[in-house]
C-alpha cells in the first residue's frame, strides 16, 4: 500500500519537525525542558518515533546550559526506545551510525533515574565498534559519517568518536567546505556543529565557523531540525572552552 506508506512517512516527518521545533523553543527560552506531551496522556506513535529520531538532541537545552536532563523527556525517550527498537540496518555502515546514536542517548539517560529502564536485564551499554577514521575511510566518507553522528556533539558526551573529532579537525573543515560547495546544507551544518564542539573543547579548527553558520541561516531550507542544529552549534560556540 504505497499511498498509506507515504502518508505514514509524512506523518512521522511532521512529528520530527514538531519535536525539533519545541526543543528549539526550549533552547531559545534558556534551557528548560521542551513541552513534548501533556502529563498523564498516552504518547501517539508518531511522537514516539520523532523522540526516537531526535535522541540525545532532546536534551540539548539542558546540556548546553549545564543543567541535568529532565525527567518527563527522559521517560518519554525510554518509552520510545521500548516501543520502537532500533531499525534493521541495511549495511554495516548504517548499523554503526545507529549504534553510536543510541549510545549517545544511553549516556544521557544514564544521568537520570530512567537510565536502567532502557534495557533493565542487560549490562551497561558499551560503545559500538570504533568508527574508522579518515586515514582508513578517506576524509570525504569519514566527514559524511561524522555529519550523521552530529547528535554526539553535545556537552557531557565523550568517547572514541569525539577523539576522532579532536584529532581530525582538518577533515571536518574539508567536509564542511565540500558540503557548502555542493549546497548540501544539512551535512554542512552538522559538520560545523562538530567544529564548534572541537573549538569549545579547546582545539584549533581550520575554518571560520560563524560565517558558515550565517550562510546556512540565510539560504537554508528553514526546517526546524536544521534550525536546531544551527542553534546547538551557536550554543557550543558560546560555551566556555573546556
Protein language model regions, located:
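Polar/charged low-complexity regulatory segments
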Residues: 1-178, 182, 186-201, 205-242
Amino acid at each position: 500500500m504505497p499511498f498509506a506508506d507515504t502518508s505514514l512517512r509524512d506523518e512521522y516527518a511532521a512529528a520530527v519537525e514538531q519535536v525539533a521545533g519545541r526543543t528549539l523553543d526550549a533552547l531559545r527560552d534558556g534551557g528548560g525542558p521542551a513541552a513534548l506531551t501533556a502529563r498523564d496522556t498516552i504518547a501517539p506513535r508518531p511522537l514516539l518515533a520523532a523522540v526516537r529520531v531526535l535522541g540525545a538532541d532532546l536534551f540539548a537545552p539542558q546540556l548546553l546550559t549545564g543543567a541535568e536532563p529532565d525527567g518527563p523527556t527522559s521517560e518519554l525517550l525510554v518509552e520510545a526506545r521500548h516501543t520502537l527498537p532500533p531499525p534493521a540496518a541495511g549495511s554495516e555502515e548504517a548499523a554503526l551510525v545507529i549504534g553510536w546514536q543510541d549510545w549517545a542517548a544511553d549516556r544521557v539517560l544514564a544521568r537520570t533515574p530512567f537510565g536502567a529502564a532502557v534495557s533493565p536485564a542487560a549490562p551497561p551499554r558499551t560503545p559500538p565498534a570504533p568508527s574508522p577514521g579518515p586515514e582508513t575511510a578517506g576524509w570525504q566518507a569519514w566527514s559524511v559519517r561524522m555529519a550523521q553522528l552530529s547528535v554526539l556533539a553535545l556537552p557531557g558526551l565523550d568517547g572514541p568518536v569525539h577523539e576522532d573529532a579532536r584529532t581530525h579537525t582538518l577533515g571536518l573543515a574539508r567536509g564542511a567546505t565540500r558540503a557548502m560547495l555542493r549546497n548540501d546544507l544539512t551535512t554542512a551544518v552538522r559538520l560545523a556543529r562538530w567544529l564548534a564542539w572541537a573549538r569549545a573543547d579547546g582545539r584549533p579548527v581550520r575554518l571560520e565557523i560563524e560565517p558558515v553558520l550565517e550562510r546556512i541561516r540565510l539560504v537554508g531550507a528553514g526546517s526546524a531540525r536544521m534550525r536546531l542544529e544551527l542553534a546547538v552549534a551557536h550554543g557550543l560556540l558560546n560555551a566556555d572552552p573546556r
